[in-house]
């Protein structure tokens, strides 16, 4: 049995200038337990080479394709332990499958893939090959979301009776009407069905609501009734969704990328028979807790009265805001901890505190149910 202390990882996608690839690299670096040693950063040769040189990837481990990378790295004695997939949605499935079949652990951006069948296949391969598979639903990584989960699980707000959550942005507002297509790299592929899949807004941000609510409450949608607005574009830019959970509780999700004045307005509100919890992403270090008949309480990250997972994954002192990169680091803390156990011959009986391929499959099912509901007169649709 080996006793490795550090991991080796590779990346597909995430060339210089790409937003999310840089976030993943910084988050992994914060954990100080893994080194980037191989990559296929871009299908464009010049961009791939430029990024490889910047991150000091040796030439023989800078690959022209993910297929070549998976094959070569799996054959090396010092090959990568896991791969990070930060490509556009359309290639998640094929890239993840190639590395799973090569026996390499996977971390993949959401949404997991295009179809439910693809997601279930990836889940099966990972299970059969005993491989770890993280899907980076960011917001479950925030310390105060973890506190909300612990309070709800402990019954501090009583029985959950209602959920009301929103995720509002305005970065696609110029697309309304379909005649003003912006030319930023992200907006072009996000609004293209060939690259983004059957949904833009729900697939990009609505699925974050579904996953974060499920993480905090343990409740999963049973059926949905949804209205999607395309505003002249090929894919949705606005969605309003009624949700019925498996336990009969109902909720409302609203997500939009055309709400002027809202930059990244994710708000999760869980209402119980004895109180409520509310977390707002743009003020991530705070959690509002209200008990019926009592004044509101505001919990601050990093303080002595915050314990459990929220304290364990606290990086810097209170008053110094933590944000997106730290949330990703918390996800990688759990994922890389499990990968390290695997490479040392200790397969974990239970995965750590991070979203897995099963959460990714749940997200794909949610997206399909929402889109199908909207296409069918907003009727109730099974998830």
PLM regions and their residue ranges:
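N-terminal Rossmann-like dinucleotide-binding module
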Residues: 1-57
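Short, Asp-centered acidic motifs that coordinate Mg2+ and/or phosphate
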Residues: 38, 82, 162
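C-terminal helix-rich "cap/oligomerization" subdomain common to oxidoreductases
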Residues: 1-6, 84, 334-383
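Predominantly a Rossmann-like dinucleotide-binding segment in NAD(P)-dependent oxidoreductases
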Residues: 139-233, 287, 377
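Glycine-rich, aromatic-lined ligand/substrate-binding cores of catalytic
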Residues: 203-285
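C-terminal glycine/acidic-rich active-site capping loop/insertion
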Residues: 138, 182, 186, 215, ...
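Beta-strand-loop-alpha-helix segment that lines the small-molecule cofactor/substrate pocket
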Residues: 82, 88-140, 155
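A structured beta-alpha segment of the ubiquitous adenosine-cofactor-binding alpha/beta core
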Residues: 61-80
């Amino acid at each position: 049995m080996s006793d490795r202390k550090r991991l080796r990882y590779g990346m597909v996608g995430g060339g210089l200038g790409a937003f999310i690839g840089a976030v993943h690299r910084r988050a992994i670096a914060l954990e100080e337990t893994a080194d980037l040693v191989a990559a296929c950063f871009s299908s464009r040769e010049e961009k791939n080479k430029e990024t490889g040189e910047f991150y000091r990837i040796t030439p023989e481990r800078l690959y022209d394709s993910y297929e070549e990378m998976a094959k070569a790295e799996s054959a090396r004695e010092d090959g990568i332990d896991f791969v990070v997939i930060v490509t556009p949605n359309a290639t998640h499935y094929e890239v993840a499958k190639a590395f799973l079949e090569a026996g390499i652990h996977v971390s993949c951006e959401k949404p997991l893939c295009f179809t439910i069948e693809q997601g279930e296949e990836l889940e099966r391969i990972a299970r059969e090959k005993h491989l770890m598979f993280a899907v980076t639903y960011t917001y479950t990584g925030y310390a105060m979301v973890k506190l909300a989960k612990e309070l709800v699980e402990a019954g501090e707000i009583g029985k959950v009776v209602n959920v009301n959550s929103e995720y509002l942005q305005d970065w696609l507002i110029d697309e309304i009407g379909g005649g003003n297509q912006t030319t930023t790299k992200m907006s072009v592929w996000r609004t293209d069905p060939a690259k983004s899949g059957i949904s833009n807004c729900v697939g990009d941000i609505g699925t974050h609501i579904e996953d974060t609510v499920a993480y905090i409450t343990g409740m999963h949608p049973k059926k949905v009734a949804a209205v999607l607005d395309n505003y002249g574009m090929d894919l949705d830019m606005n969605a309003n969704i009624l949700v019925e959970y498996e336990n009969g509780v109902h909720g409302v999700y609203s997500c939009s990328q055309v709400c002027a004045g809202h930059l990244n307005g994710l708000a999760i509100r869980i209402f119980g028979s004895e109180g409520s919890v509310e977390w707002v992403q743009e003020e991530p270090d705070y959690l509002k807790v209200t008990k019926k008949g009592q004044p509101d309480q505001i919990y601050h990250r990093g303080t002595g009265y915050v314990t459990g997972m929220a304290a364990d994954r606290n990086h810097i002192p209170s008053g110094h805001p933590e944000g997106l990169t730290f949330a990703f680091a918390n996800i990688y803390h759990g994922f890389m901890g499990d990968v390290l156990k695997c490479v040392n011959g200790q397969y974990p009986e239970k995965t750590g505190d991070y979203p897995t391929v099963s959460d990714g499959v749940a997200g794909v099912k949610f997206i399909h149910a929402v889109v199908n509901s909207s296409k069918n007169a907003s009727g109730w649709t099974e998830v």
